[in-house]
Amino acid sequence: MAELPKYVLEPLRRGDRFYVRSKRLAKLRLLFLLLLGSCIFAPPMHSQIAQEETLGGPDSHETGQGPHGHLFGEWAGERSRLLERGVKFDFQYVSDSLWNIKSDKKERFASWNRFRWTVDVDFGELVGQRDLFFHATALWQGGGNLGAYLGLLTSPSGMSSMNTTRLDSWWLEKRWLDEKITARIGQFAGQDFYGAQHYAASFIFEPMGYALGNLFTDFESFDPPSTPAMEVRVVPLHNFYVKSMVEAEDRDPFAHNPTGLVPQFRGGPVSISEIGFTPGKKATTLRAFDTVESRKGYSGLYQFGASYNPGKFTTASGVSQSGDYLLYWMASQAIWRVDPKGAKGLDATFAYDWNPPDINRNNTMLTAGLRFNEPLPLPIHNTMSLGYVQNRLSQQFVPPGAPRWKPEHAIEFNALLDPLPMLLLQPVIQYYANVGAKTGRALVFGFRTKVEF
């Protein structure tokens, strides 16, 4: 049985069923890594691609920071001088402060806090090695997990997981032919780029504020405990892309690599692929998460993806078998604009995923949402978003004599406000029905705070 991780539902210890890689597979993987590495450092072709956003979900930047976008300022101009050389530093704090103001459990305040340090390097600007980039990010995070306390399938926070201080991800990225071909190798999470919600920064609860919540079932990696990975992306047509990655499976990543500094190969290779259609935008310019600048005009993103893990899994009947997979469909579209070339207006998003109900208890999820960009007549950036999540458990895993599971429903409304260039506030209210696929309701209120240092 494949379930969500221990910090979402319950402890998941299956060391005795880890998929064991053969020596032949290990040699092939090492050979592929060496070949890809040699391609990354091949002589560059000319391009003038600027640095762009490399963080996603709650850590992404809705707007550019600009000259007054940091609490500590420009370091006497040193930040700008480094950026001119292709080196960008980012230090931020994000917190979700949430209360269950009504539920079957006693009222509780839970605050999840995260400090993140990030460096991005454009070697074209730094040493003349064009189209070669480096990214690394580390964090400290900790606090209370309200979703685990309430027994929810849908986590109220897109950040909460485990208390940790660690290197999250790093990679080297090489681009050819004006980004028509891109290769990346390093340590990064599948859920940062596959099954990730394009409008994630506009929502708080996890399935819409980061990535689809049951991508964990076949052990697609997530941040911050990213695993070794490699990816290739190809853009054969103006509005169409194909990308695929292979990552190392790890069924208990926080325990096996607590610092993130020692690459771990604890299971088989998990493969993830996606095709995408990008009406209104060049596929080469599109990233996993949108920004205020990228949402201008009637742009959209339509995705179909699949992940496959060849490891050992246990079915609902207790039989061990090899292989598990997940399919997902996602759509994000600007449906109305005040100015056809502007960002003010209404966006819609929809996503659905499925994997075999005889292997996966958390086997299907549906999300849908609306976002109104700049609804308030204010000089600051603001949005209002309404989201819905339906979480279903496979009836094949209902314990004998227990009642059938019900679909858990979650609704969220939030407003995002940018009162200062370095400060973001996002008050939110959430309602949950059939908590934990059983009975019961919960009402959660709180806010997200983000500070750029």
Give short role names for the model-derived ranges.
Residues P43-D96, N100, K106, V127:
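N-terminal periplasmic/intermembrane-space "pro-region" immediately following the signal or transit peptide
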Residues G73-F89, D122-F134, L177-K180, N239, ...:
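Short loop/turn motifs that connect adjacent beta-strands in outer-membrane beta-barrel proteins
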Residues F89-S97, F134-W140, A183-Q187, V242-A248, ...:
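Transmembrane beta-barrel strands of outer-membrane/channel proteins
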Residues W117, W170, A183, M230, ...:
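Membrane-embedded beta-strands of outer-membrane beta-barrel proteins
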Residues L146-W171, D178-S271, Q396:
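Surface-exposed coil loops of outer-membrane beta-barrel proteins
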Residues A255-L261, E274-T278, G305-Q321, Y325, ...:
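Outer membrane beta-barrel transmembrane domains
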Residues R441-F453:
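Outer-membrane beta-barrel "beta-signal"
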